[in-house]
Amino acid sequence: MIGFIRGLLVAKRAPSLLIDVQGLGYELDAPMSTFYNLPEIGAEVRLYTHLQIREDAHSLFGFGTEAERGLFRSLIRVSGIGAKLALAILSGISVDDFRACVERQDSARLVRLPGIGKKTAERLIIELRDRLDIGVPSLAPASFAGGAAPLPAADPADEAVSALIALGFKPQEANTLVARQAAEGRSAEDLIRAALQSAVR
């Protein structure tokens, strides 16, 4: 089992990132809650990880805190919740807010998350009410300057739309959400954060 990964951040295009660990490139998917705290390209990053092994693929997921990873692991144990949907949930709500929703049985807020309908929200509350395995809160990943060369930057709006689609939004919905937030000089991370916040209001 891979508990964490530390190396140079080579590329990041939500929800995927590439980390160079002593010359070996690891591809990971991460929730936006982790992306918001990533350093610049070329800096060192340390992430907690979860390795998912299936017959057709081995997938690695990265998280800025143990709490995020703990919630991810709890989510994918719920019937009908896969890794992609679990990342979308983590991208749209904080660990503490999710815990509060489950404790208060607040399905109304959960259904505003991408890919979550009424039945799924109710299932999350029922199955996680007594067994949330979130783990111990942790500081953001340690990072400092490294030596990797930056890659050409993608258009922030296009990158934001692609990230939202990868998180479960329909293309038209993703385009609309980003268009509402678009402003000159905003980064892809800023656009994604604003779009997700407007989607769950």
UniProtKB/Swiss-Prot annotation:
Signal peptide: none annotated. Residues 144-153 are annotated as: Flexible linker. Pfam families: HHH_5, RuvA_C, RuvA_N. One of its GO terms (molecular function) is four-way junction DNA binding. Keywords: Cytoplasm, DNA damage, DNA recombination, DNA repair, DNA-binding. One of its GO terms (biological process) is DNA repair. GO terms for cellular component: cytoplasm; Holliday junction helicase complex; Holliday junction resolvase complex. Gene3D superfamilies: 5' to 3' exonuclease, C-terminal subdomain, DNA helicase RuvA subunit, C-terminal domain, Nucleic acid-binding proteins. Residues 153-201 are annotated as: Domain III. Residues 1-64 are annotated as: Domain I. It is found in: Cytoplasm. Residues 65-143 are annotated as: Domain II. Has three domains with a flexible linker between the domains II and III and assumes an 'L' shape. Domain III is highly mobile and contacts RuvB. The RuvA-RuvB-RuvC complex processes Holliday junction (HJ) DNA during genetic recombination and DNA repair, while the RuvA-RuvB complex plays an important role in the rescue of blocked DNA replication forks via replication fork reversal (RFR). RuvA specifically binds to HJ cruciform DNA, conferring on it an open structure. The RuvB hexamer acts as an ATP-dependent pump, pulling dsDNA into and through the RuvAB complex. HJ branch migration allows RuvC to scan DNA until it finds its consensus sequence, where it cleaves and resolves the cruciform DNA. Belongs to the RuvA family. NCBIfam families: ruvA. Homotetramer. Forms an RuvA(8)-RuvB(12)-Holliday junction (HJ) complex. HJ DNA is sandwiched between 2 RuvA tetramers; dsDNA enters through RuvA and exits via RuvB. An RuvB hexamer assembles on each DNA strand where it exits the tetramer. Each RuvB hexamer is contacted by two RuvA subunits (via domain III) on 2 adjacent RuvB subunits; this complex drives branch migration. In the full resolvosome a probable DNA-RuvA(4)-RuvB(12)-RuvC(2) complex forms which resolves the HJ. This is Holliday junction branch migration complex subunit RuvA. It comes from Methylococcus capsulatus (strain ATCC 33009 / NCIMB 11132 / Bath). The gene is ruvA.
